[in-house]
């Protein structure tokens, strides 16, 4: 059995076992501009220098193809070439880049300046995802006002947590970011977190 098949099997198995319930609703746009500006990064409260971002890794298919084919896929900006895991880490973590957001005053949706990916919640795992191709999946739920709910999670019926719920997060030694109902007991592999808006220059970003 190939590594990819084993990975898929464990991912499906654990995803079914860790299904969570949450009720995300649209909220009024409020206080989304951060302390000083409309462009911001999300810092984990109480963990200085730890931000919400993406960790990239090379998939099994990339490692088995020729250098020429891999280079062509990279130049073509194929979204599946380097899968991204939404996680929290410090800015100097290898293969990690913080997500930089800007406020949309009309819809309250955060958008990454670098890749313009739209966030959504996976209704099976509860994981917050930004993968540009995965929004077509049956279990994708677009969330209007997601940033506001992350900043004020207890007010809007959700908890935000960093989790090690599946095979991928264990292998990559980096947690996923998940959302749960406010009254739900978190699994023992999850830790509740809070996020705050920080202006990029204040966080050490140019």
Swiss-Prot record:
Signal peptide: 1-19
A GO CC term assigned to this protein in UniProt: cytosol
Sites carrying sugar chains: 26, 48, 91, 139, 152, 183
Domain of life: Eukaryota
Coiled coil: none
Induction: By zinc depletion.
Pfam families on file: Vel1p
Main localization category: cytoplasm
Localization per record: Cytoplasm, Cytosol
PTM entry text: N-glycosylated.
Key words of the record: Cytoplasm, Glycoprotein, Signal, Zinc
Family classification: Belongs to the VEL1 family.
Descriptive protein name: VEL1-related protein YOR387C
Organism field: Saccharomyces cerevisiae (strain ATCC 204508 / S288c)
């Amino acid at each position: 059995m190939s590594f990819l098949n084993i990975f898929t099997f464990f991912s499906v198995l654990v995803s079914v076992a860790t299904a969570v319930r949450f009720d995300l609703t649209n909220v009024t746009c409020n206080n989304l501009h951060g302390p000083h500006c409309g462009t911001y990064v999300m810092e984990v409260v109480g963990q200085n220098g730890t931000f919400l971002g993406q960790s990239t890794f090379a998939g099994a298919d990339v490692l088995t193809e020729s250098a020429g084919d891999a280079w062509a896929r990279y130049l073509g900006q194929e979204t599946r070439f380097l899968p991204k895991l939404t996680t929290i880490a410090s800015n100097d973590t290898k293969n990690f880049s913080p997500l930089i957001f800007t406020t949309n005053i009309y819809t309250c949706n955060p958008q990454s300046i670098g890749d313009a990916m739209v966030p959504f919640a996976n209704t099976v795992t509860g994981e917050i995802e930004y993968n540009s191709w995965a929004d077509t999946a049956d279990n994708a739920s677009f969330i209007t006002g997601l940033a506001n709910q992350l900043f004020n999670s207890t007010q809007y019926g959700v908890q935000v947590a960093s989790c090690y719920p599946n095979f991928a997060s264990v292998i990559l030694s980096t947690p996923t970011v998940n959302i749960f109902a406010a009254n739900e007991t978190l699994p023992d592999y999850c830790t509740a977190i809070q996020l705050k808006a920080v202006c990029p220059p204040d966080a050490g970003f140019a």
